[in-house]
């Protein structure tokens, strides 16, 4: 058995899980998510837990087992608690602002960069150098945070750019100035 796949997913109070064929739908206080899982994976609701099982010990089924369980667990967490990712802007004059729903980044280009968060996503700017992406779908939250970071990735010499709050930038030593090679 998969170590992750065999663990049951606890359903908190206020969350409802329904299964129709191979489509799992999770409703909770923050919203609703549904996802189609592979046809071979068996998902059952037993009391206040969701159990994910596989039909055989094939390598393919083993790999899907843990994945499917984690996807269901992320759906349950998303509709009950939600997910968030924090980003920081490092650099002189680098700042973020919110215009309506859009996020406007000033990060050293000749023009401000506008990013529209997708449906079900929310962007907060508590400070000009801090961005928080929130939502119920972990995949979408991570993808939007990665897209924001990709606008100006941190460079290794001064560390300027947009980075995740917990990310540590590996620094490089710059060239040493001097009269190397001069006669």
From Swiss-Prot:
GO terms for cellular component: cytosolic large ribosomal subunit. Gene3D superfamilies: Ribosomal protein L6, alpha-beta domain. Pfam families: Ribosomal_L6. InterPro entries: Ribosomal_uL6-like, Ribosomal_uL6-like_a/b-dom_sf, Ribosomal_uL6_a/b-dom, Ribosomal_uL6_bac-type, Ribosomal_uL6_CS. GO terms for biological process: cytoplasmic translation. GO terms for molecular function: rRNA binding; structural constituent of ribosome. Keywords: Ribonucleoprotein, Ribosomal protein, RNA-binding, rRNA-binding. Signal peptide: none annotated. This protein binds to the 23S rRNA, and is important in its secondary structure. It is located near the subunit interface in the base of the L7/L12 stalk, and near the tRNA binding site of the peptidyltransferase center. PANTHER family: 60S/50S RIBOSOMAL PROTEIN L6/L9 (PTHR11655), LARGE RIBOSOMAL SUBUNIT PROTEIN UL6M (PTHR11655:SF14). Part of the 50S ribosomal subunit. Belongs to the universal ribosomal protein uL6 family. This is Large ribosomal subunit protein uL6. It comes from Heliobacterium modesticaldum (strain ATCC 51547 / Ice1).
